[in-house]
C-alpha cells in the first residue's frame, strides 16, 4: 500500500469527494484507511459509569484506499506515488507529477 499514516490525502470519489485530510490509520488487510474528518458516521454509545458518558458520538469510518490519492507537499496536487532509491540506498516515495520526494524521513 502506497499510503502511510500521516500523509495528506484527497478523496477522489463518493460523498466526500474533494475533501482533504490527514491519514490517521492504515488497515492493509482490508485495503482501507481512516482519514481525519472524512466519512463521518454516528455511533450510539452506551454509558459506562466509571469510564465514559453515553450518547451519540460522531467519528471517522474507514474508506477504501482506492478512493483517495496522496497530495504532494511540494506541488500541492493529488498525485500517483512512485518509488526510487536515493544515493545512500534508501527506498523513498516520490511524486510522479513534479518528481519531489514525499517521505519526510
Curated annotation (Swiss-Prot):
It comes from the Bacteria. One of two assembly initiator proteins, it binds directly to the 5'-end of the 23S rRNA, where it nucleates assembly of the 50S subunit. One of the proteins that surrounds the polypeptide exit tunnel on the outside of the subunit. Keywords: Ribonucleoprotein, Ribosomal protein, RNA-binding, rRNA-binding. The gene is rplX. InterPro entries: KOW, Rib_uL2_dom2, Ribosomal_uL24, Ribosomal_uL24_CS, Ribosomal_uL24_KOW, Translation_prot_SH3-like_sf. It comes from Thermotoga petrophila (strain ATCC BAA-488 / DSM 13995 / JCM 10881 / RKU-1). Part of the 50S ribosomal subunit. This is Large ribosomal subunit protein uL24. GO terms for molecular function: rRNA binding; structural constituent of ribosome. It holds the Pfam family ribosomal_L24. GO terms for cellular component: ribonucleoprotein complex; ribosome. Belongs to the universal ribosomal protein uL24 family. PROSITE patterns: RIBOSOMAL_L24.
Amino acid at each position: 500500500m502506497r499510503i502511510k499514516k500521516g500523509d495528506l490525502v484527497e478523496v477522489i470519489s463518493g460523498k466526500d469527494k474533494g475533501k482533504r485530510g490527514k491519514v490517521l490509520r492504515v488497515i492493509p488487510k482490508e485495503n482501507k484507511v481512516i482519514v481525519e474528518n472524512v466519512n463521518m458516521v454516528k455511533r450510539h454509545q452506551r454509558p459506562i459509569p466509571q469510564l465514559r458518558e453515553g450518547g451519540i458520538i460522531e467519528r471517522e469510518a474507514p474508506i477504501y484506499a482506492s478512493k483517495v490519492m496522496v497530495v504532494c507537499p511540494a506541488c500541492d496536487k493529488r498525485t500517483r506515488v512512485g518509488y526510487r532509491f536515493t544515493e545512500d540506498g534508501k527506498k523513498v516515495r516520490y511524486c510522479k507529477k513534479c518528481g519531489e520526494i514525499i517521505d519526510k524521513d
